[in-house]
Structure formats: structure tokens, C-alpha cells
Amino acid sequence: MAIKTVGIVGAGQMGSGIAHVCALAGYDVLLHDAAADRLEKGIATINGNMARQVSSGKLEDEQRSAAMSLIRPANSMEDLAGVDLAIEAATEDETVKRKIFTQLCPILNPQAILATNTSSISITRLASTTDRPERFIGIHFMNPVPLMKLVELVRGIATDEETFRKSKDFVTALGKSVTVAEDFPAFIVNRILLPMINEAIYTLYEGVGTVEAIDTAMRLGANHPMGPLQLADFIGLDTCLSIMQVLHDGLADSKYRPCPLLVKYVEAGWLGRKTGRGFYDYRGEQPVPTR
């Protein structure tokens, strides 16, 4: 069974980005979110992002219109019953993801592939909560999905070869490059990236440099497109903390201990750009460092 229809659970930054690239590649897309306002906002975000692609000359307006016509809001999870591939793109919280799979599995066609966009959690462990561990796989898109070329494919211990092959063909059809990671905490990209961000936060916490000094040092000294603290705000500090906790718990190494300052910011609700405040304050016309 070829993949023709894709269901996406979660209409936030990642889910809407995945829907965006799937529709541009010609897939029928059903986008679901438990919150109706997030679903409405997600579809509006896709349309706005495609409109910017048209304005910049990267997309024809006819392509935007055709792609948007392929995206349908799914107000109920039951609307995903006929999809060939279901992708969970909810928050990086294992309890939330398990609950989604428990609700979704009885609805899906028995032959449908079930995927998670988790950036750190064990694929094998998540698969064990489903009725189809052999047709369960990690398809980890990078943020922002329309711009980033890489997708990590991660097999659980039970993932069969047909599921892997179909998933790889699907990702390739989206115009993305595939890298295959083994099922270890945080896979490849975040196993390397998040400890670097965590170390930057420790550098701030210990007073080695200010927010501006740290980000400038890494932009100009290491040729990074954005500084690690700015990147943390973009990712979301709650997501950064979740990934560091997965690394720390899964690998039992103190080098992955989340910085206390990161923990404090998350406890304060300072999650970065999405809440208006993190290592930068985004509530004015221009972002301003908070420390």
C-alpha cells in the first residue's frame, strides 16, 4: 500500500510544518489538534508561510493554492481513520504521546504506518504502547520543517523493513535528505546539539559571559547562523529541558545534567519565543537579552 494520505496529530510549530511540506509534495493531509484554536492557527500559519514563499519567489501562487487545497482540518481524531501514515507531532512529553497512541491505534487502518516526530524519546518504548510495533517508526523532522533539509529515521527494535522502506521513500518524496539513527536517547542531531546548548546556558549561569557575549562568540567565532541561547529560545526551553532530561536519565552521565538556570526558566514559564520571554525578551519591537 503506497502512502497517499497523511494524518498529523498536533498542529503546533512542528505539526503545521510537516503538513506544509506534505501538501507541497502532493500528499492529501488531515491535520488534527485537540484544541480547535490551535488547529485553526496551524492552518493559518501554513497559509502565511506559503504566502511568504510566493512573495520571495520560491513558490508560485498556483502551487500555494493547490497545496492548501490538499490540507483538511480534522476536528476529531476519528477523521484519521483512512490515512496511510499517521504522524504524531505533539509536545515532547512521553505521557502525552502514549495517550495519543492509545486513542489513535483503534481508529487507524491495521495496515497504516504510525510514526512519531519525537526528538529524543525511545522509539522502542513508544512502540510498545501501540498495536503495531512492527509498523511504528521515528520520523524526526528538523525545525523549521519547510526550511531544514534533514530528517532522522529511527527504527525501534520491532520496526519491519517494509515500514522503514516506505518511510524512507516518503521522506525522499518530500525533498528531504535522510539520515538513519539508532534508537539511543536523542538520536544524532540532538545528542550533539542539546549538550552544546546546555553548556552555553551553564556559561551564562556561571557568569562567564552575558547572553549577548555568548551568542556573538558562537556566531562569529564558530560561524553558527544563530547563537546557542537564541536557538534555545527558538526551539523552546521546555523542549530543551525535556531532551536533556531524556539524555541524563537514559545515559546516566552527569555531563547531561540540565543546567539549573534552564530548569528555573521553564519553571517560571519563560519558554522562549513562543511565550515572549526566554534568554531574550520578545515583547518589544526587537528581542532584548534578559541577562
Where are these regions (language model features)?
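NAD(P)+-binding Rossmann beta1-loop-alpha1 motif at the extreme N-terminus of oxidoreductases
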Residues: 1-52, 56
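Structural motif
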Residues: 9, 32, 74, 89, ...
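NAD(P)-dependent Rossmann-like dehydrogenase/reductase catalytic/cofactor-binding core
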Residues: 27, 161-165, 172-183, 202-206, ...
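Rossmann-fold dinucleotide-binding core
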Residues: 113-182, 187-191
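Amphipathic alpha-helical segments at domain termini/boundaries
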Residues: 24, 31, 65-85, 166, ...
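Rossmann-like NAD(P)-binding element
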Residues: 38, 52-113, 121
